[in-house]
């Protein structure tokens, strides 16, 4: 990053994005955060905007001399009924409507493209914070044959589902696909898997994995899979053996606590 330019995080102001904002602000005082959640938050260099207030957002980015944008933090799917003309955003409605028909991933990709059109760079969170990722030394390198079967089956299923812009997570145990992530998110998926394993009389045996990975054609700049200490806690409660992820494309929340668990 150039010394006279700034970084901006755009997304929902949640625990993960908040933690990165704190880290970046300590390194780069000019870092700003644009919160797109409906819940208003207050902090230094934090701004609250509706996702359709594109003109105001672009003006702020230019005023603060932002070059790199990190897209991070959960946001609700934009409701087009809340749309209002602002002189710029209406130019992108056809593009967003077309993306809506394809799925959430396409909508997020369209959002990234809009900012690129205005000469901003999409930056990976990993570029500025190595603590959000795991290294090869942090992960197990050998698996039992039955574990490889569960992980491989889950990975292939997620690749197939990528065509439908759907899930990033699957639970597979003893060769059975137990549950596929839908709109409920990973925590709810693991709660559901725990109950299903009980119903299938699997729960007494520790087996299976939560497998998380990005969609095949997904942007590496937005909506990356996230795991943290709570993920590990829920994996244990579901009596699964563990977690399988793509360490190059998965964000780790509270890495120290995550590894201790």
For the regions a language model picked out, list residue spans one by one:
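Conserved mixed alpha/beta catalytic, RNA-binding, or beta-rich assembly cores of soluble enzyme
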Residues: 13-17, 101-105, 119-236
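General beta-strand structural signal in soluble alpha/beta enzymes
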Residues: 9-11, 32-35, 69-72, 122-127, ...
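Conserved strand-to-helix beginnings and helix N-cap segments that scaffold or border functional pockets
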Residues: 18-21, 183, 255-256
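Short coil/turn connectors at secondary-structure junctions
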Residues: 2-6, 27-30, 42, 64-67, ...
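N-terminal basic/disordered segments at the start of proteins
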Residues: 2-36
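Feature captures the catalytic cores and cofactor-binding loops of soluble hydro-lyases/lyases
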Residues: 36-42, 46-66, 84-96, 103, ...
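Gly/Ser/Thr-rich loops at beta-strand to alpha-helix junctions
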Residues: 11-16, 74-78, 105, 250
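N-terminal glycine-rich phosphate/adenylate-binding segment common to multiple enzyme folds
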Residues: 57-127
């Amino acid at each position: 990053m150039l010394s006279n330019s700034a970084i901006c995080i755009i997304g929902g102001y949640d625990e993960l994005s908040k933690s990165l904002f704190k880290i970046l602000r300590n390194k780069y005082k000019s870092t700003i955060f644009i919160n797109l959640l409906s819940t208003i938050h207050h902090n230094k260099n934090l701004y609250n905007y509706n996702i359709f207030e594109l003109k105001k957002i672009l003006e702020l980015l230019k005023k603060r001399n932002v070059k790199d944008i990190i897209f991070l933090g959960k946001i609700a799917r934009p409701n087009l009924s809340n749309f209002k003309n602002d002189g710029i955003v209406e130019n992108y409605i056809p593009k967003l409507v077309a993306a809506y028909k394809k799925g959430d991933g396409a909508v997020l990709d369209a959002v990234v493209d809009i900012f690129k059109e205005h000469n901003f760079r999409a930056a990976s969170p990993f570029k500025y914070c190595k603590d959000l990722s795991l290294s090869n030394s942090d992960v197990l390198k050998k698996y039992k044959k039955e574990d490889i079967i569960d992980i491989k089956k889950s990975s292939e299923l997620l690749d197939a589902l990528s065509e439908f812009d759907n899930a990033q997570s699957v639970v597979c145990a003893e060769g059975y696909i137990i549950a596929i992530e839908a709109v409920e998110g990973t925590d709810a998926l693991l709660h559901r898997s725990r109950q299903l394993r009980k119903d299938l009389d699997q729960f007494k045996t520790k087996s299976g994995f939560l497998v998380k990975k990005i969609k095949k054609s997904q942007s590496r700049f937005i909506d990356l899979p996230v795991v943290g200490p709570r993920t590990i806690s829920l994996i244990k409660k579901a009596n699964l053996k563990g977690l399988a992820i793509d360490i190059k494309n998965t964000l780790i929340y509270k890495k120290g606590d995550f590894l201790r668990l």
